[in-house]
Curated annotation (Swiss-Prot):
Family, per entry: Belongs to the PsbY family.
Assembly, per entry: PSII is composed of 1 copy each of membrane proteins PsbA, PsbB, PsbC, PsbD, PsbE, PsbF, PsbH, PsbI, PsbJ, PsbK, PsbL, PsbM, PsbT, PsbX, PsbY, Psb30/Ycf12, peripheral proteins PsbO, CyanoQ (PsbQ), PsbU, PsbV and a large number of cofactors. It forms dimeric complexes.
Taxonomic placement: Bacteria, Bacillati, Cyanobacteriota, Cyanophyceae, Synechococcales
GO biological process: photosynthesis
Xref: NCBIfam families: PRK13240.1
InterPro entries recorded: PSII_PsbY (IPR009388)
Gene (name only): psbY
Subcellular location(s) of the protein: Cellular thylakoid membrane
UniProt xrefs under HAMAP family: PSII_PsbY
Source taxon at top rank: Bacteria
Lipid bilayer topology: Single-pass membrane protein
Protein name: Photosystem II reaction center protein Y
Keywords for the protein's UniProt record, in alphabetical order: Membrane, Photosynthesis, Photosystem II, Thylakoid, Transmembrane, Transmembrane helix
């Protein structure tokens, strides 16, 4: 099980990175709203 986790961890990290890059404009908008509300 641990070996499987070691194998899939980089794959999951890569997918998360791709999703992060795709949603970057949405994240920037979220950060703008969040920082605006944080004041």
């Amino acid at each position: 099980m641990l070996r499987t986790l070691v194998v899939f961890a980089p794959i999951i990290a890569a997918l998360a990175w791709v999703i992060f890059n795709i949603q970057k404009p949405a994240r920037e908008q979220f950060n703008r709203d969040f920082l605006g509300k944080k004041d």
